[in-house]
């Protein structure tokens, strides 16, 4: 598994744009290729979940969506994905009320280029519940991995991003925009 200080590997996934529930809306495609070169000069919060249409995953996705503006205020793009395809993600958005018109990017890593490049494939064949905070130079600055049965805390990811961006010493339990040492 790649860790802090490692460079984000080359990858190509199908991105599902924020706010779309259908493959095309008003003549605009919901899909766009996302690579390591996408979103230049932005921080990236890349999180993985095991499968679409499951039970824990939508709670995390919805919470990242609720916090999307706060991430964007910190020049960060949130991207959440699994190995399920892009059409599955759109169907899930239409099916689950908390994911309707989801305001953040999702991605389909059907080839495993990013899952395997980061080294986060579980023995079951799905992605581990991993989160990577990547700086604008595509260097990994934070990694967190949970077992398949435990959801993560997107608010904690926001807190960590905020602390990393201070470039200062940040104490335990420092609140978002809190004091540094």
Regions found by a protein language model. Give the residues of each.
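Chalcogenol-based redox active-site neighborhoods
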Residues: 1-181
